[in-house]
Amino acid sequence: MKNQLIDRLTRYTTIDTQSDPKSTTTPSTEKQWDLLHLLERELQQLGLPTDLDENGYLFATLESNIDADVPTVGFLAHVDTSPDFNASNVKPQIIENYDSKPYKLGNTKRVLDPKVFPELNSLVGHTLMVTDGTSLLGADDKAGIVEIMEAICYLQEHPEIKHGTIRIGFTPDEEIGRGPHKFDVDRFNADFAYTMDGSQYGELQYESFNAAEAVITCHGVNVHPGSAKNAMVNAIRLGEQFDSLLPDSEVPERTEGYEGFYHLMNFEGTVEKATLQYIIRDHDKKQFELRKKRILEIRDDINAHFENYPVKVDISDQYFNMAEKILPLPHIIDIPKRVFAKLDIPANTEPIRGGTDGSQLSFMGLPTPNIFTGCGNFHGPYEYASIDVMEKAVQVIIGIVEDIAENN
């Protein structure tokens, strides 16, 4: 199967599907259609009925080959790649029998070094796909697409493997947080699903952050600095004051595990107007609400010193911890856990310090945990995919549909 995985991943990663957060269309970029149309053709060649809507959501069905009435399971992956780094002219490189020594990426000065990325030490002997140092790879989440497609191919070639109805979904714009925004849960018509969008071997994730964005707008009064005493209000300094009132220890670079944070993503301005953009994250719903409350309290504390209330705050929720919807349905986690055990894969159920499409889909009525893909260092030139771990991910998909058929 390795050669098929390499060929398919190469074919998909060389198609530029970068999403654009500034766009107002869905998909956010026309080039995402290039991969969507290719996948539509490939699914149809496998004999699967497909449904590609005007927003770039591609659904397909592999019909049940058993008489028993078992739950319909879905498998999901996103076609877009991150806007954080160059995604054009991707030139995948193959490392056979990886030896954990530093590897120079193409003709660049970039080096894939286990001292910097220690998780590479667990991949000794694996076949890796990496970049040439000039682009991201796009294995996030094209590896997930490959794994779903190869699992479907295998099931088609092995009709003796019993399974219920399987729904497949390939979606746009996950990287800019809009993946589920126009996802039609009723049209997808699955009882539950799994995103193939994790990273390291053994990841099985069903806890995500609660997430919000806060935009702080500071309005100043611009006066000639020579006569500014008791008259000027510097919006930039108001922004600095606002940020200084948040706890220094509760930032991404000083937190881990279940610890939440405030993250200042952008700060720009002039004397007259400054804008701060934060993301707020916490696994605990109560702490999440307290974090949002703290933002409002800081606004009020600063505004109390002025007559015209110069600091404005706009907070918007982005997604919530999917554990709230998944934990009441333990069979959704028990199924992959049984499969992992059968395949001797150690299950890593640590919480996601982020979110997936499943975070939103779970609250839309489609409970959706996340499963590993075998890739790492997403969104940049050091991205890689272990073909060996991808093969295991294919086996997990096959094992899940077998387990559902056997255990109903």
Curated annotation (Swiss-Prot):
Record's keyword terms, sorted: Aminopeptidase, Cytoplasm, Hydrolase, Metal-binding, Metalloprotease, Protease, Zinc
Annotated positions binding Zn(2+) 1: 78, 140, 197
Keyword Cytoplasm: yes
Gene Ontology terms for molecular function: metallopeptidase activity; tripeptide aminopeptidase activity; zinc ion binding
Catalytic activity: Release of the N-terminal residue from a tripeptide
NCBIfam families for this protein: peptidase-T, PRK05469.1, PRK13381.1
An individual GO BP term: peptide catabolic process
Family assignment from sequence similarity: Belongs to the peptidase M20B family.
EC category name: hydrolase
Location in or out of the cell: Cytoplasm
Keyword Cytoplasm: yes
Database matches in InterPro entries: ArgE/DapE_CS, Bact_exopeptidase_dim_dom, Peptidase_M20, Peptidase_M20_dimer, Peptidase_M20B
Gene3D superfamilies, alphabetized: 3.30.70.360, Zn peptidases
Active-site residues (renumbered): 80, 174 (proton acceptor)
Note accompanying the cofactor annotation: Binds 2 Zn(2+) ions per subunit.
Residues noted as binding Zn(2+) 2 in the record, renumbered to the chain: 140, 175, 379
Any one Gene Ontology cellular component term annotated for this protein: cytosol
Protein name (Swiss-Prot/TrEMBL): Peptidase T
Function as written in the Swiss-Prot or TrEMBL entry: Cleaves the N-terminal amino acid of tripeptides.
Main location: cytoplasm
EC number: 3.4.11.4
Cofactor(s) this protein cannot do without: Zn(2+)
